[in-house]
Curated annotation (Swiss-Prot):
Reactions listed under catalytic activity: ATP + H2O + 4 H(+)(in) = ADP + phosphate + 5 H(+)(out)
Species this protein is from: Methanococcus maripaludis (strain C6 / ATCC BAA-1332)
Domain of life of the source: Archaea
Primary localisation category: membrane
Name of the protein in question: A-type ATP synthase subunit A
Pfam families on file: ATP-synt_ab, ATP-synt_ab_N, ATP-synt_ab_Xtn, ATP-synt_VA_C
Amino acid sequence: MVVGKIIKISGPVVVAEGMKGSQMFEVVKVGNEGLTGEIIQLTEDEAIIQVYEETAGIKPGEGVTGTGAPLSVELGPGMLKAMYDGIQRPLNEIENATDSIYIPRGVSVPSISREIKWDFEPIAAVGDEVITGDVIGTVQETASIVHKIMIPFGVSGKIKEIKAGSFTVEETIAVVETAEGEKEIMMMQKWPVRKPRPSKGKQAPVIPLITGQRVEDTFFGLAKGGASAIPGPFGSGKTVTQHQLAKWSDVDVVVYIGCGERGNEMTEVIEEFPHLDDIKTGNKLMDRTVLIANTSNMPVAAREASVYTGITIAEYFRDQGLGVLLTADSTSRWAEAMREISGRLEEMPGEEGYPAYLSSKLAQFYERAGRVECLGSENKQGFVCIVGAVSPPGGDFSEPVTSNTLRIVKVFWALDANLARRRHFPAINWLTSYSLYIDDIAGWWQQNTAADWRSLRDEAMSLLQKEAELQEIVQLVGPDALPDRERVILEIARMLREDFLQQDAYHEVDSYCSPIKQYHMLKIIMTFYKKGLDAVAKGADPAGISAVTVKGDIARMKYLVEDEFVNTKVPEIINKMESELGALIK
Protein backbone atom coordinates (compact mmCIF):
# COMPACT_ATOMS: atom_id res chain seq x y z
CA MET A 1 0.00 0.00 0.00
CA VAL A 2 1.51 3.31 -1.13
CA VAL A 3 1.53 6.13 1.46
CA GLY A 4 2.47 9.62 0.25
CA LYS A 5 2.34 13.18 1.52
CA ILE A 6 0.38 16.23 0.31
CA ILE A 7 2.60 19.02 -1.07
CA LYS A 8 0.04 21.22 -2.87
CA ILE A 9 -3.72 21.83 -2.81
CA SER A 10 -5.65 23.77 -5.46
CA GLY A 11 -9.41 23.45 -5.01
CA PRO A 12 -10.39 19.86 -5.86
CA VAL A 13 -6.87 19.10 -7.17
CA VAL A 14 -4.23 17.79 -4.74
CA VAL A 15 -0.55 17.04 -5.50
CA ALA A 16 1.17 14.35 -3.39
CA GLU A 17 4.78 13.11 -3.32
CA GLY A 18 6.11 9.69 -2.38
CA MET A 19 3.51 7.99 -4.59
CA LYS A 20 5.87 5.73 -6.58
CA GLY A 21 4.13 2.42 -7.28
CA SER A 22 0.67 4.00 -7.68
CA GLN A 23 -1.41 3.42 -10.80
CA MET A 24 -3.37 5.75 -13.06
CA PHE A 25 -7.00 6.15 -11.92
CA GLU A 26 -6.27 4.44 -8.59
CA VAL A 27 -8.53 5.49 -5.71
CA VAL A 28 -6.70 7.11 -2.80
CA LYS A 29 -7.68 8.39 0.65
CA VAL A 30 -6.55 11.99 1.07
CA GLY A 31 -5.69 13.79 4.33
CA ASN A 32 -6.47 12.94 7.95
CA GLU A 33 -10.20 12.72 7.18
CA GLY A 34 -9.68 10.12 4.42
CA LEU A 35 -11.35 12.02 1.57
CA THR A 36 -11.94 9.93 -1.56
CA GLY A 37 -9.83 10.91 -4.57
CA GLU A 38 -8.60 9.48 -7.86
CA ILE A 39 -5.14 9.74 -9.41
CA ILE A 40 -5.39 11.50 -12.78
CA GLN A 41 -1.69 12.17 -13.49
CA LEU A 42 1.62 10.56 -12.42
CA THR A 43 5.14 12.06 -12.68
CA GLU A 44 8.01 10.01 -11.16
CA ASP A 45 7.01 9.89 -7.48
CA GLU A 46 4.42 12.69 -7.67
CA ALA A 47 0.71 12.08 -8.22
CA ILE A 48 -1.99 14.59 -9.12
CA ILE A 49 -5.30 13.63 -7.53
CA GLN A 50 -8.82 14.90 -8.17
CA VAL A 51 -10.72 14.78 -4.88
CA TYR A 52 -14.41 13.89 -4.90
CA GLU A 53 -15.14 15.74 -1.65
CA GLU A 54 -14.70 19.30 -0.37
CA THR A 55 -10.97 19.92 0.29
CA ALA A 56 -11.34 22.93 2.63
CA GLY A 57 -9.26 22.43 5.78
CA ILE A 58 -6.77 19.83 4.57
CA LYS A 59 -3.14 21.01 4.54
CA PRO A 60 0.28 20.11 3.08
CA GLY A 61 2.03 17.40 5.05
CA GLU A 62 -1.09 15.27 5.60
CA GLY A 63 -0.95 11.71 4.28
CA VAL A 64 -2.31 10.15 1.08
CA THR A 65 -2.99 6.41 1.16
CA GLY A 66 -3.43 4.30 -1.98
CA THR A 67 -6.09 1.59 -2.10
CA GLY A 68 -4.56 -0.33 -5.02
CA ALA A 69 -7.92 -0.40 -6.85
CA PRO A 70 -9.54 1.81 -9.51
CA LEU A 71 -12.79 3.71 -8.89
CA SER A 72 -15.38 0.91 -8.98
CA VAL A 73 -19.08 0.46 -8.36
CA GLU A 74 -20.83 -2.32 -6.48
CA LEU A 75 -23.39 -4.12 -8.64
CA GLY A 76 -26.10 -6.36 -7.24
CA PRO A 77 -29.58 -6.47 -5.66
CA GLY A 78 -30.42 -3.29 -3.76
CA MET A 79 -29.59 -0.67 -6.40
CA LEU A 80 -33.14 -0.08 -7.61
CA LYS A 81 -35.10 2.61 -5.72
CA ALA A 82 -31.76 3.81 -4.28
CA MET A 83 -30.34 7.32 -4.52
CA TYR A 84 -26.57 7.66 -4.79
CA ASP A 85 -24.11 10.51 -4.99
CA GLY A 86 -21.53 10.67 -7.82
CA ILE A 87 -19.26 7.98 -6.32
CA GLN A 88 -22.12 5.59 -5.44
CA ARG A 89 -22.50 6.46 -1.78
CA PRO A 90 -26.15 5.84 -0.75
CA LEU A 91 -27.62 9.16 0.42
CA ASN A 92 -30.44 7.62 2.49
CA GLU A 93 -27.98 5.39 4.37
CA ILE A 94 -25.65 8.35 5.03
CA GLU A 95 -28.54 10.40 6.42
CA ASN A 96 -29.60 7.53 8.69
CA ALA A 97 -26.02 6.86 9.87
CA THR A 98 -25.03 10.50 10.51
CA ASP A 99 -28.40 12.14 11.28
CA SER A 100 -27.38 15.01 8.99
CA ILE A 101 -28.90 16.42 5.80
CA TYR A 102 -25.35 17.08 4.52
CA ILE A 103 -22.78 14.46 3.54
CA PRO A 104 -20.00 14.53 6.19
CA ARG A 105 -16.49 14.50 4.71
CA GLY A 106 -14.69 11.17 4.63
CA VAL A 107 -17.87 9.20 5.35
CA SER A 108 -17.75 5.61 4.10
CA VAL A 109 -20.98 3.64 3.75
CA PRO A 110 -21.36 0.47 1.61
CA SER A 111 -23.11 1.21 -1.69
CA ILE A 112 -25.29 -1.89 -1.35
CA SER A 113 -26.64 -2.86 2.07
CA ARG A 114 -24.79 -5.75 3.73
CA GLU A 115 -27.68 -6.44 6.15
CA ILE A 116 -30.64 -6.99 3.79
CA LYS A 117 -31.24 -10.65 2.97
CA TRP A 118 -32.51 -11.44 -0.53
CA ASP A 119 -34.43 -14.58 -1.51
CA PHE A 120 -32.21 -16.34 -4.05
CA GLU A 121 -33.81 -18.89 -6.39
CA PRO A 122 -31.26 -20.98 -8.34
CA ILE A 123 -31.77 -21.65 -12.04
CA ALA A 124 -28.54 -23.60 -12.58
CA ALA A 125 -27.84 -26.96 -10.93
CA VAL A 126 -24.78 -28.75 -9.55
CA GLY A 127 -22.67 -30.12 -12.42
CA ASP A 128 -23.73 -27.46 -14.97
CA GLU A 129 -20.97 -25.90 -17.08
CA VAL A 130 -21.09 -22.11 -16.81
CA ILE A 131 -19.24 -19.20 -18.44
CA THR A 132 -19.03 -15.45 -17.82
CA GLY A 133 -22.48 -13.85 -18.03
CA ASP A 134 -24.52 -17.02 -17.44
CA VAL A 135 -27.53 -16.52 -15.15
CA ILE A 136 -27.35 -18.95 -12.23
CA GLY A 137 -30.35 -17.65 -10.27
CA THR A 138 -32.79 -14.80 -9.66
CA VAL A 139 -33.85 -12.40 -6.92
CA GLN A 140 -37.20 -10.56 -6.92
CA GLU A 141 -35.65 -7.16 -6.16
CA THR A 142 -38.75 -4.99 -6.65
CA ALA A 143 -42.31 -5.65 -7.82
CA SER A 144 -41.21 -4.72 -11.37
CA ILE A 145 -37.73 -6.22 -11.72
CA VAL A 146 -36.43 -9.77 -11.29
CA HIS A 147 -32.70 -9.32 -10.70
CA LYS A 148 -30.63 -11.96 -12.51
CA ILE A 149 -27.50 -13.15 -10.68
CA MET A 150 -24.73 -13.72 -13.24
CA ILE A 151 -21.36 -15.45 -13.26
CA PRO A 152 -18.80 -12.59 -12.90
CA PHE A 153 -16.28 -11.65 -15.58
CA GLY A 154 -13.30 -14.02 -15.90
CA VAL A 155 -14.99 -17.04 -14.24
CA SER A 156 -15.96 -20.23 -16.09
CA GLY A 157 -16.15 -23.87 -15.06
CA LYS A 158 -18.48 -26.40 -13.44
CA ILE A 159 -20.88 -25.63 -10.59
CA LYS A 160 -19.79 -27.59 -7.53
CA GLU A 161 -22.32 -26.16 -5.11
CA ILE A 162 -25.41 -23.89 -5.35
CA LYS A 163 -28.06 -23.25 -2.73
CA ALA A 164 -31.46 -21.59 -2.46
CA GLY A 165 -32.47 -19.40 0.46
CA SER A 166 -32.09 -15.92 1.95
CA PHE A 167 -28.63 -14.41 1.68
CA THR A 168 -26.91 -11.05 1.98
CA VAL A 169 -25.02 -9.79 -1.09
CA GLU A 170 -21.65 -10.90 0.42
CA GLU A 171 -22.62 -14.45 1.34
CA THR A 172 -21.61 -17.34 -0.94
CA ILE A 173 -24.51 -18.64 -3.03
CA ALA A 174 -22.53 -20.94 -5.34
CA VAL A 175 -19.07 -22.45 -5.83
CA VAL A 176 -17.61 -22.90 -9.33
CA GLU A 177 -14.71 -25.25 -10.09
CA THR A 178 -12.41 -23.43 -12.51
CA ALA A 179 -9.02 -24.25 -14.02
CA GLU A 180 -7.41 -22.05 -11.31
CA GLY A 181 -9.33 -23.67 -8.43
CA GLU A 182 -12.64 -23.14 -6.67
CA LYS A 183 -14.30 -19.70 -6.97
CA GLU A 184 -16.99 -18.58 -4.55
CA ILE A 185 -19.85 -16.67 -6.20
CA MET A 186 -21.86 -14.05 -4.34
CA MET A 187 -24.72 -11.83 -5.48
CA MET A 188 -22.56 -8.68 -5.64
CA GLN A 189 -19.96 -7.83 -8.28
CA LYS A 190 -17.52 -4.91 -8.53
CA TRP A 191 -16.63 -3.20 -11.80
CA PRO A 192 -14.27 -0.27 -12.63
CA VAL A 193 -16.39 2.65 -13.86
CA ARG A 194 -14.06 3.76 -16.66
CA LYS A 195 -13.96 0.31 -18.27
CA PRO A 196 -16.94 -0.54 -20.54
CA ARG A 197 -18.53 -3.88 -19.65
CA PRO A 198 -17.88 -6.37 -22.48
CA SER A 199 -20.48 -8.04 -24.70
CA LYS A 200 -20.48 -10.52 -27.61
CA GLY A 201 -21.09 -7.68 -30.06
CA LYS A 202 -23.31 -4.76 -30.97
CA GLN A 203 -26.44 -5.14 -33.08
CA ALA A 204 -28.12 -2.79 -35.53
CA PRO A 205 -30.53 -0.34 -33.84
CA VAL A 206 -33.74 -1.13 -35.75
CA ILE A 207 -36.41 -0.99 -33.00
CA PRO A 208 -37.62 2.47 -31.91
CA LEU A 209 -37.63 3.51 -28.28
CA ILE A 210 -41.28 4.44 -27.69
CA THR A 211 -41.35 7.50 -25.43
CA GLY A 212 -45.04 8.40 -25.75
CA GLN A 213 -44.05 11.90 -26.93
CA ARG A 214 -45.41 12.49 -30.45
CA VAL A 215 -42.70 14.85 -31.71
CA GLU A 216 -39.96 12.45 -30.52
CA ASP A 217 -41.54 9.18 -31.68
CA THR A 218 -43.11 10.14 -35.01
CA PHE A 219 -40.81 12.87 -36.30
CA PHE A 220 -37.40 12.35 -34.64
CA GLY A 221 -37.36 8.76 -33.44
CA LEU A 222 -34.63 7.32 -31.21
CA ALA A 223 -33.71 3.65 -31.68
CA LYS A 224 -33.22 1.24 -28.79
CA GLY A 225 -29.48 1.37 -28.16
CA GLY A 226 -29.16 4.86 -29.63
CA ALA A 227 -27.85 8.13 -28.21
CA SER A 228 -29.63 11.47 -28.25
CA ALA A 229 -28.85 15.03 -27.20
CA ILE A 230 -31.35 17.57 -25.87
CA PRO A 231 -29.68 20.98 -26.07
CA GLY A 232 -31.59 24.07 -25.08
CA PRO A 233 -31.29 27.39 -23.26
CA PHE A 234 -32.53 27.90 -19.71
CA GLY A 235 -36.28 27.53 -19.26
CA SER A 236 -36.86 25.70 -22.55
CA GLY A 237 -37.99 22.47 -20.86
CA LYS A 238 -34.94 20.16 -20.82
CA THR A 239 -35.65 18.76 -17.37
CA VAL A 240 -39.39 18.21 -17.94
CA THR A 241 -38.57 16.48 -21.25
CA GLN A 242 -36.13 14.18 -19.45
CA HIS A 243 -38.66 13.49 -16.70
CA GLN A 244 -41.20 12.53 -19.39
CA LEU A 245 -38.66 10.15 -20.95
CA ALA A 246 -37.91 8.60 -17.57
CA LYS A 247 -41.65 8.18 -16.87
CA TRP A 248 -42.95 6.75 -20.13
CA SER A 249 -40.08 5.21 -22.13
CA ASP A 250 -40.44 1.61 -23.24
CA VAL A 251 -37.57 0.32 -21.05
CA ASP A 252 -37.14 -1.97 -18.03
CA VAL A 253 -34.79 0.23 -15.97
CA VAL A 254 -34.14 3.99 -15.84
CA VAL A 255 -30.86 5.44 -14.54
CA TYR A 256 -31.38 9.16 -13.90
CA ILE A 257 -28.20 11.22 -13.38
CA GLY A 258 -28.62 14.73 -12.01
CA CYS A 259 -25.18 16.02 -12.95
CA GLY A 260 -24.51 19.52 -11.58
CA GLU A 261 -28.13 20.67 -11.81
CA ARG A 262 -30.43 22.05 -9.11
CA GLY A 263 -31.29 19.83 -6.16
CA ASN A 264 -35.00 20.62 -6.52
CA GLU A 265 -35.07 18.74 -9.84
CA MET A 266 -33.98 15.54 -8.09
CA THR A 267 -36.51 16.26 -5.32
CA GLU A 268 -39.26 16.42 -7.97
CA VAL A 269 -38.27 12.96 -9.23
CA ILE A 270 -38.25 11.52 -5.68
CA GLU A 271 -41.66 13.01 -4.92
CA GLU A 272 -43.36 12.13 -8.24
CA PHE A 273 -42.04 8.69 -9.19
CA PRO A 274 -43.24 6.72 -6.11
CA HIS A 275 -46.82 7.81 -6.95
CA LEU A 276 -46.76 7.18 -10.73
CA ASP A 277 -47.61 3.83 -12.33
CA ASP A 278 -45.41 2.18 -14.94
CA ILE A 279 -47.61 1.51 -18.00
CA LYS A 280 -45.61 -1.64 -18.78
CA THR A 281 -45.96 -3.43 -15.40
CA GLY A 282 -48.59 -1.42 -13.51
CA ASN A 283 -46.18 -1.03 -10.58
CA LYS A 284 -44.66 2.21 -9.31
CA LEU A 285 -42.07 3.95 -11.50
CA MET A 286 -39.61 4.16 -8.60
CA ASP A 287 -39.40 0.33 -8.62
CA ARG A 288 -37.41 0.47 -11.87
CA THR A 289 -35.35 3.61 -11.21
CA VAL A 290 -31.81 4.28 -9.97
CA LEU A 291 -31.10 7.92 -9.07
CA ILE A 292 -27.64 9.48 -9.05
CA ALA A 293 -27.73 12.94 -7.49
CA ASN A 294 -24.71 15.12 -8.01
CA THR A 295 -26.24 18.53 -7.55
CA SER A 296 -24.64 21.89 -8.31
CA ASN A 297 -23.46 22.47 -4.72
CA MET A 298 -21.58 19.13 -4.56
CA PRO A 299 -17.83 18.99 -5.42
CA VAL A 300 -17.26 19.49 -9.16
CA ALA A 301 -14.84 16.57 -9.58
CA ALA A 302 -17.60 14.10 -8.69
CA ARG A 303 -19.60 15.17 -11.77
CA GLU A 304 -17.34 13.12 -14.00
CA ALA A 305 -17.58 10.16 -11.61
CA SER A 306 -21.40 10.41 -11.57
CA VAL A 307 -21.59 10.04 -15.35
CA TYR A 308 -19.31 6.98 -15.37
CA THR A 309 -21.04 5.47 -12.31
CA GLY A 310 -24.42 5.82 -14.05
CA ILE A 311 -23.35 4.24 -17.34
CA THR A 312 -21.67 1.29 -15.53
CA ILE A 313 -24.86 0.58 -13.56
CA ALA A 314 -26.84 0.83 -16.83
CA GLU A 315 -24.49 -1.66 -18.56
CA TYR A 316 -24.89 -4.12 -15.66
CA PHE A 317 -28.68 -4.18 -16.10
CA ARG A 318 -28.17 -4.39 -19.89
CA ASP A 319 -26.07 -7.54 -19.34
CA GLN A 320 -29.09 -9.17 -17.68
CA GLY A 321 -30.95 -8.81 -21.00
CA LEU A 322 -32.88 -5.71 -19.94
CA GLY A 323 -33.54 -2.42 -21.73
CA VAL A 324 -32.08 0.61 -19.95
CA LEU A 325 -32.56 4.35 -20.44
CA LEU A 326 -29.82 6.57 -19.03
CA THR A 327 -30.60 10.27 -18.81
CA ALA A 328 -27.84 12.73 -17.88
CA ASP A 329 -28.93 16.25 -16.90
CA SER A 330 -26.73 18.02 -17.80
CA THR A 331 -23.53 17.03 -19.63
CA SER A 332 -22.60 20.73 -19.86
CA ARG A 333 -22.02 20.79 -16.09
CA TRP A 334 -19.68 17.80 -16.44
CA ALA A 335 -17.80 19.64 -19.21
CA GLU A 336 -17.55 22.73 -16.97
CA ALA A 337 -16.05 20.55 -14.21
CA MET A 338 -13.50 19.23 -16.74
CA ARG A 339 -12.68 22.82 -17.68
CA GLU A 340 -12.16 23.80 -14.04
CA ILE A 341 -9.88 20.84 -13.27
CA SER A 342 -8.00 21.30 -16.55
CA GLY A 343 -7.37 24.94 -15.58
CA ARG A 344 -6.04 23.93 -12.16
CA LEU A 345 -3.73 21.41 -13.86
CA GLU A 346 -2.45 24.31 -16.01
CA GLU A 347 -3.17 22.40 -19.24
CA MET A 348 -3.28 24.18 -22.59
CA PRO A 349 -6.92 25.28 -23.03
CA GLY A 350 -8.89 24.50 -26.17
CA GLU A 351 -11.93 26.31 -27.54
CA GLU A 352 -13.66 28.55 -24.95
CA GLY A 353 -11.29 27.26 -22.26
CA TYR A 354 -12.50 23.65 -22.45
CA PRO A 355 -9.71 21.02 -22.47
CA ALA A 356 -8.50 19.69 -25.83
CA TYR A 357 -9.74 16.19 -24.87
CA LEU A 358 -13.38 17.32 -24.42
CA SER A 359 -14.64 15.55 -27.56
CA SER A 360 -12.86 12.25 -26.77
CA LYS A 361 -14.31 12.23 -23.22
CA LEU A 362 -17.84 12.86 -24.56
CA ALA A 363 -17.34 10.13 -27.19
CA GLN A 364 -16.16 7.61 -24.56
CA PHE A 365 -19.41 8.21 -22.68
CA TYR A 366 -21.90 8.19 -25.59
CA GLU A 367 -20.24 5.21 -27.31
CA ARG A 368 -21.17 3.03 -24.33
CA ALA A 369 -24.78 3.17 -25.56
CA GLY A 370 -25.86 0.31 -27.81
CA ARG A 371 -28.02 -2.73 -28.39
CA VAL A 372 -25.87 -5.79 -27.68
CA GLU A 373 -25.81 -9.54 -27.51
CA CYS A 374 -24.92 -10.18 -23.87
CA LEU A 375 -22.16 -12.47 -22.63
CA GLY A 376 -23.17 -15.99 -21.61
CA SER A 377 -24.33 -19.22 -23.21
CA GLU A 378 -27.97 -18.03 -23.41
CA ASN A 379 -29.16 -15.78 -26.22
CA LYS A 380 -29.71 -12.60 -24.16
CA GLN A 381 -30.10 -9.19 -25.75
CA GLY A 382 -30.08 -5.89 -23.90
CA PHE A 383 -29.65 -2.23 -24.73
CA VAL A 384 -28.63 1.08 -23.19
CA CYS A 385 -30.08 4.32 -24.58
CA ILE A 386 -28.34 7.54 -23.56
CA VAL A 387 -30.17 10.87 -23.56
CA GLY A 388 -27.88 13.73 -22.59
CA ALA A 389 -29.16 17.22 -21.87
CA VAL A 390 -26.86 20.04 -22.94
CA SER A 391 -27.17 23.58 -21.54
CA PRO A 392 -25.44 25.94 -24.00
CA PRO A 393 -25.03 29.45 -22.54
CA GLY A 394 -27.48 31.79 -24.27
CA GLY A 395 -28.84 28.92 -26.38
CA ASP A 396 -25.78 29.05 -28.66
CA PHE A 397 -25.60 25.63 -30.37
CA SER A 398 -22.20 26.42 -31.89
CA GLU A 399 -20.45 26.30 -28.49
CA PRO A 400 -17.98 23.39 -27.98
CA VAL A 401 -20.05 21.03 -25.79
CA THR A 402 -23.10 21.12 -28.11
CA SER A 403 -21.09 20.93 -31.34
CA ASN A 404 -18.93 18.03 -30.08
CA THR A 405 -21.99 16.18 -28.80
CA LEU A 406 -23.73 16.54 -32.18
CA ARG A 407 -20.76 14.89 -33.89
CA ILE A 408 -21.30 11.77 -31.75
CA VAL A 409 -25.07 11.31 -31.33
CA LYS A 410 -27.53 10.48 -34.12
CA VAL A 411 -30.63 12.16 -32.67
CA PHE A 412 -30.83 15.89 -32.00
CA TRP A 413 -33.88 17.24 -30.16
CA ALA A 414 -33.29 21.01 -30.31
CA LEU A 415 -35.24 22.92 -27.68
CA ASP A 416 -36.23 26.43 -28.70
CA ALA A 417 -36.68 29.31 -26.24
CA ASN A 418 -39.09 31.07 -28.65
CA LEU A 419 -41.39 28.03 -28.68
CA ALA A 420 -41.20 27.83 -24.89
CA ARG A 421 -42.13 31.52 -24.61
CA ARG A 422 -45.16 30.83 -26.85
CA ARG A 423 -46.07 28.00 -24.45
CA HIS A 424 -45.50 25.35 -27.12
CA PHE A 425 -44.30 22.26 -25.23
CA PRO A 426 -42.37 20.07 -25.76
CA ALA A 427 -40.42 23.02 -27.24
CA ILE A 428 -38.58 20.81 -29.77
CA ASN A 429 -37.95 22.82 -32.93
CA TRP A 430 -39.12 20.71 -35.90
CA LEU A 431 -36.96 22.70 -38.35
CA THR A 432 -33.58 22.25 -36.63
CA SER A 433 -34.04 18.83 -34.96
CA TYR A 434 -33.19 15.60 -36.78
CA SER A 435 -32.90 11.83 -36.38
CA LEU A 436 -30.54 9.65 -38.39
CA TYR A 437 -32.40 6.49 -37.27
CA ILE A 438 -35.59 7.13 -39.30
CA ASP A 439 -34.58 4.80 -42.16
CA ASP A 440 -33.66 2.05 -39.65
CA ILE A 441 -36.85 2.23 -37.57
CA ALA A 442 -39.36 2.92 -40.38
CA GLY A 443 -39.81 -0.85 -40.93
CA TRP A 444 -40.96 -1.34 -37.31
CA TRP A 445 -43.46 1.52 -37.57
CA GLN A 446 -44.89 0.24 -40.86
CA GLN A 447 -45.22 -3.25 -39.39
CA ASN A 448 -46.84 -2.10 -36.12
CA THR A 449 -49.04 0.77 -37.34
CA ALA A 450 -49.67 0.93 -41.11
CA ALA A 451 -47.78 0.72 -44.40
CA ASP A 452 -48.26 4.44 -45.12
CA TRP A 453 -46.60 5.62 -41.85
CA ARG A 454 -43.38 6.78 -43.54
CA SER A 455 -45.12 8.69 -46.33
CA LEU A 456 -47.45 10.44 -43.82
CA ARG A 457 -44.51 11.42 -41.61
CA ASP A 458 -42.42 12.74 -44.53
CA GLU A 459 -45.37 14.68 -45.96
CA ALA A 460 -46.15 16.26 -42.57
CA MET A 461 -42.49 17.30 -42.20
CA SER A 462 -42.47 18.88 -45.66
CA LEU A 463 -45.68 20.83 -44.81
CA LEU A 464 -44.04 22.28 -41.68
CA GLN A 465 -40.98 23.28 -43.72
CA LYS A 466 -43.23 24.82 -46.40
CA GLU A 467 -45.04 26.80 -43.68
CA ALA A 468 -41.71 28.27 -42.49
CA GLU A 469 -40.98 29.43 -46.06
CA LEU A 470 -44.46 30.97 -46.43
CA GLN A 471 -44.27 32.81 -43.09
CA GLU A 472 -41.93 35.45 -44.54
CA ILE A 473 -44.45 36.24 -47.31
CA VAL A 474 -47.36 36.22 -44.83
CA GLN A 475 -45.59 38.76 -42.60
CA LEU A 476 -45.19 41.08 -45.61
CA VAL A 477 -48.54 40.79 -47.40
CA GLY A 478 -50.83 38.81 -45.07
CA PRO A 479 -52.32 35.31 -45.59
CA ASP A 480 -55.22 36.51 -47.80
CA ALA A 481 -52.80 37.41 -50.62
CA LEU A 482 -51.61 33.80 -50.91
CA PRO A 483 -53.02 31.32 -53.47
CA ASP A 484 -55.82 29.11 -52.11
CA ARG A 485 -53.63 25.99 -52.03
CA GLU A 486 -51.00 27.70 -49.86
CA ARG A 487 -53.65 29.04 -47.47
CA VAL A 488 -54.73 25.42 -46.92
CA ILE A 489 -51.07 24.45 -46.29
CA LEU A 490 -50.79 27.17 -43.62
CA GLU A 491 -53.96 25.93 -41.91
CA ILE A 492 -52.83 22.27 -41.91
CA ALA A 493 -49.35 23.22 -40.62
CA ARG A 494 -51.02 25.11 -37.76
CA MET A 495 -53.08 22.00 -36.97
CA LEU A 496 -49.94 19.86 -36.99
CA ARG A 497 -48.22 22.25 -34.60
CA GLU A 498 -51.09 22.78 -32.17
CA ASP A 499 -53.04 19.52 -32.38
CA PHE A 500 -50.21 17.02 -32.93
CA LEU A 501 -46.82 18.37 -31.83
CA GLN A 502 -48.01 20.18 -28.71
CA GLN A 503 -48.41 17.79 -25.79
CA ASP A 504 -49.38 18.41 -22.16
CA ALA A 505 -46.94 16.66 -19.80
CA TYR A 506 -49.31 17.21 -16.85
CA HIS A 507 -52.53 15.90 -18.46
CA GLU A 508 -53.40 12.36 -17.39
CA VAL A 509 -54.27 11.22 -20.96
CA ASP A 510 -52.11 13.45 -23.15
CA SER A 511 -48.92 12.88 -21.13
CA TYR A 512 -48.43 9.55 -22.96
CA CYS A 513 -49.51 8.79 -26.53
CA SER A 514 -49.18 5.24 -27.90
CA PRO A 515 -47.79 4.54 -31.42
CA ILE A 516 -51.24 3.51 -32.73
CA LYS A 517 -52.86 6.69 -31.42
CA GLN A 518 -50.00 8.79 -32.86
CA TYR A 519 -50.49 7.21 -36.28
CA HIS A 520 -54.27 7.78 -36.32
CA MET A 521 -53.92 11.40 -35.15
CA LEU A 522 -51.43 12.11 -37.95
CA LYS A 523 -53.56 10.20 -40.47
CA ILE A 524 -56.65 12.32 -39.63
CA ILE A 525 -54.77 15.62 -40.04
CA MET A 526 -53.20 14.51 -43.34
CA THR A 527 -56.59 13.24 -44.58
CA PHE A 528 -58.02 16.69 -43.79
CA TYR A 529 -55.15 18.18 -45.85
CA LYS A 530 -55.88 16.01 -48.91
CA LYS A 531 -59.65 16.53 -48.73
CA GLY A 532 -59.13 20.27 -48.13
CA LEU A 533 -56.97 20.53 -51.27
CA ASP A 534 -59.61 18.61 -53.27
CA ALA A 535 -62.33 20.95 -52.01
CA VAL A 536 -60.30 24.06 -52.94
CA ALA A 537 -59.57 22.62 -56.40
CA LYS A 538 -63.35 22.19 -56.86
CA GLY A 539 -64.10 25.78 -55.88
CA ALA A 540 -64.37 25.81 -52.07
CA ASP A 541 -63.29 28.95 -50.20
CA PRO A 542 -60.17 28.40 -47.95
CA ALA A 543 -61.81 30.59 -45.28
CA GLY A 544 -64.68 28.08 -45.17
CA ILE A 545 -62.25 25.19 -44.72
CA SER A 546 -60.71 27.02 -41.73
CA ALA A 547 -64.17 27.42 -40.17
CA VAL A 548 -65.48 23.80 -40.29
CA THR A 549 -66.55 22.42 -36.89
CA VAL A 550 -64.67 19.12 -37.37
CA LYS A 551 -61.50 21.07 -36.57
CA GLY A 552 -62.70 21.25 -32.95
CA ASP A 553 -62.98 17.44 -32.88
CA ILE A 554 -59.45 17.17 -34.30
CA ALA A 555 -58.12 19.58 -31.65
CA ARG A 556 -59.71 17.49 -28.86
CA MET A 557 -58.55 14.07 -30.08
CA LYS A 558 -55.28 14.21 -28.08
CA TYR A 559 -57.31 14.18 -24.84
CA LEU A 560 -59.29 11.03 -25.73
CA VAL A 561 -58.40 7.62 -24.30
CA GLU A 562 -56.82 5.42 -26.99
CA ASP A 563 -59.54 2.72 -27.22
CA GLU A 564 -62.37 5.24 -27.49
CA PHE A 565 -60.44 7.34 -30.01
CA VAL A 566 -59.22 4.55 -32.33
CA ASN A 567 -62.38 2.43 -32.31
CA THR A 568 -65.13 5.07 -32.15
CA LYS A 569 -63.90 8.59 -32.84
CA VAL A 570 -61.64 8.03 -35.87
CA PRO A 571 -64.47 6.88 -38.21
CA GLU A 572 -66.79 9.58 -36.78
CA ILE A 573 -64.25 12.37 -37.44
CA ILE A 574 -63.54 11.10 -40.99
CA ASN A 575 -67.28 10.97 -41.83
CA LYS A 576 -67.91 14.43 -40.36
CA MET A 577 -64.90 15.81 -42.26
CA GLU A 578 -66.15 14.41 -45.59
CA SER A 579 -69.66 15.80 -45.14
CA GLU A 580 -68.55 19.28 -43.98
CA LEU A 581 -65.87 19.72 -46.66
CA GLY A 582 -68.21 18.29 -49.30
CA ALA A 583 -70.83 20.92 -48.38
CA LEU A 584 -68.32 23.72 -49.15
CA ILE A 585 -67.88 22.70 -52.79
CA LYS A 586 -69.83 25.05 -55.06
